[in-house]
């Protein structure tokens, strides 16, 4: 029953995965997917509302937004007030700064992650400078979106990672 409900095209419109599905360029999908996944906690309606606000700021191409550095004005590095729940404008500045570095040095986030060792989750945590020891459910969801190809929901655009290396974090 779960697969019929959550792994079909009809699910996309009501889920945060709708945002990366709006794009065709790999870099746009990566940026949209990562930032949307990072925000995916709390009330679903609030997640979708705030993710929509973020995507309006980024305009038609998250990739061009990152490269243009407009995020430096929209998300000042010293701004500690909240953008979404406990995520501050400064937090998003840090995410955009890491993405800017990745895209100016590598062709994609996928390529940037490959400089790190370990399974995909460890690589992504190293890139974001967060602990790989916590469950990181949102980041695992992002990796699923990028790596899995066996669902209408997941985008499956990353070729260099194996879906067998994905993990399902459990609450303890």
Where are these regions (language model features)?
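HhH-family (HhH-GPD) DNA N-glycosylase catalytic core used in base-excision repair
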Residues: 1-172
């Amino acid at each position: 029953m779960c697969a019929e409900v959550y792994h079909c095209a009809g699910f996309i419109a009501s889920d945060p995965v709708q945002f990366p599905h709006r794009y065709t360029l790999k870099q746009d999908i990566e940026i949209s997917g990562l930032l949307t996944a990072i925000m995916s906690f709390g009330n679903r309606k609030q997640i979708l509302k705030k993710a929509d606000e973020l995507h309006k700021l980024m305009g038609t191409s998250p990739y061009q937004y990152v490269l243009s550095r407009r995020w430096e004005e929209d998300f000042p590095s010293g701004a500690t007030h909240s953008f979404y729940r406990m995520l501050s404008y400064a937090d998003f500045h840090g995410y955009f700064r890491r993405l800017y570095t990745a895209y100016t040095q590598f062709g994609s986030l996928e390529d940037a992650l490959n400089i790190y060792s370990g399974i995909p989750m460890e690589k992504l945590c190293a890139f974001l400078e967060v602990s790989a020891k916590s469950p990181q459910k949102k980041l695992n969801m992002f990796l699923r979106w990028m790596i899995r190809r066996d669902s209408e929901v997941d985008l499956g655009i990353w070729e260099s990672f194996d879906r067998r290396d994905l993990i399902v974090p459990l609450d303890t």
